[in-house]
Every structure is written in structure tokens, then in C-alpha cells.
Amino acid sequence: MKKLKAISAVVVCICLIASIFAGCSKISLEGKWVSTIDLTEEFSEGGDMSGDAEMGQYYDKLNIPLSVDVIYTFDSDNSYTCVPDEEKFKADFDEAVEKMLDYMIEGMYKYAEAEGMSKNEFDAFYKETNGASLRDDIRSETKADIDSIYKELIDEITESEPQKLGIEDDRFYHTDDNGNKLGYQTFTLEGDTLTITGEYDMQDKPVDEDEYPIVLTKMAE
């Protein structure tokens, strides 16, 4: 299985967006907020076999829905921490992995049928040859990568140390260690909905346009 490196790239930016209002005395985000990040494209691209030179003809384009809810907790000074809803995400992630196994197995069945073997014949042949069922063998072979991907995602999303950054007007500025501005994000705030509308460099050129808008919704007390 291809390692899903692209997933963490999508999730990295959400650990910063919640800090937009820190240091702004006119606005308080105290409480809990949630943002749902869609990982479908990244997860599916990582496991897609349709472009494989040898086996691609036996696979359709992969599309497995997957998302993660990220919960931000703001203090009265707008410093924040963020964590994924790990119980929900673990269940959703495990379900997505099972669907990916189904996808991989179905392609192998198509290959076997092209070679003149039925599914049952291929299952029996595979188990006799490898000492395990096709599904169990694939799960065993991919377990280390899958566990690593899951841990990487959780680590990228989690910010356990309180974070605090600043704001100017409707812009959140990224800075280096010396306080030099590197780029900024724009936002709107309407009631309990915070929308990050875009990200730009200091020449006002859009960055990662496909990742926006990102929406945070305030959770009930």
C-alpha cells in the first residue's frame, strides 16, 4: 500500500487557524469550537491503484470518504489547544481502511479471473501458498504503515501546549521567530461561525487555494 503522505499536509494548517484572534481584546472566542476537515481526496489518492503500471487495469479510481473533526478549546485570553475527536476518527479511519482492503482484494480477484481462476479457487490457492487468507495477509502486511499514518495524523492535529498569536484587522499573520511577517490568512466571523477564507503570501498571492474555505463552528456549552 502506498503511504498516505498527503493527508498530513492537509491537516497541518488547521493547527494554526484557531489562533487568529489571540491578542485581540475586542473579540473573545472562549469556549470550544469544531472544524471538520475532509481527507477523502488525500486518503483515496494514497491508496489508488488505477494508475499502477502492472495492476492498474484491474482497479477503478478509488474514492473512500474520510474526514476528521478537530476541537479547539479557547481560554479567556484567546490562547488555545486543539485535539481531534479521536474516538470518532478512529472508528471512521478503521472503516475507511477496511474499504481500502476491499478495494485491493477486488482488484486481485479481477486479476485472478483474467488468469482463469474463480474467486474461490484464488482464495484457496492464496491461502495454501501464503499460509493465510488474502485479507489477513494484506492486513498484516499493511498494518505498520496504517498504524504509522494514523499516529502521524493524530500528532499533526494535536496541539496540547496553549498557543497564542496576533491579528490585524481581518487578517491573521504568520511570523518567524523574529516576528517577521511571512504570510497571512483572511477570515469572517458571523455569530458562532468562523470562516477562514484564504491564505496569502506577503505579495498577496494565494497559497493552497484548494484548502479553503475552512469553517469552525462554536460548540454548545
Task: Label each PLM-derived region with a short phrase.
Residues 4-25:
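Sec-dependent N-terminal signal peptides of Gram-positive bacterial secreted proteins and lipoproteins
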Residues 38-45, 52, 56-214:
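Contiguous, well-ordered beta-strand patches that form the walls/edges
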